[in-house]
């Protein structure tokens, strides 16, 4: 029997029987795995807390006929504020859904693992406006997946002047001379462009200090949503819930 030892983040867990739970684990060393915690629904079971959503733990797991099974576990990090705060919980749920969907089973991605862990730690410890954190996380995630939007020059010709449009299909900001090249190019407010660039580049800690007018956030939301749809061909249900809780 082959045993795997790895640190992992619990992205989500569900009931699989009257006594057991199955968890989606994002493991540091083996990617996304489905693992069963036998007896996790029993209050006295050693696995009762082993697959609580968003925890980070060290696991020993083994492969069965249909699933992996948890043999041992040891807690590394528990996010108490996420459990207590609905806004933080909504952001953590968004992180969980996005990572669950962009990752294929058993696809190791160490950079994405540590990005996910860091993002959850930021949600836990910082007090950033919900929509602003969500936008920044999404831009950082899609960039890590290889679709970083060009925001400081024209995505078509490379010029840094007159960036008056945005095109998801062309990959970012577009100058006025190239906008007809991109069929989906839409006018881009300079303040929105500056906001998007800041969200992409700034560390999460810096986001606590900014306040942005609602009209700018609304336009940024439209651009990011369309960009994600174009490049990932996905919408995320948990986003709507998080946005409803935004300040």
From Swiss-Prot:
The lineage of its organism: Bacteria, Bacillati, Bacillota, Clostridia, Thermoanaerobacterales. This is DNA repair protein RecO. SUPFAM superfamilies: ArfGap/RecO-like zinc finger, Nucleic acid-binding proteins. GO terms for cellular component: bacterial nucleoid. The keyword DNA repair applies. Keywords: DNA damage, DNA recombination, DNA repair. Signal peptide: none annotated. Involved in DNA repair and RecF pathway recombination. GO terms for biological process: DNA recombination; double-strand break repair. Belongs to the RecO family.
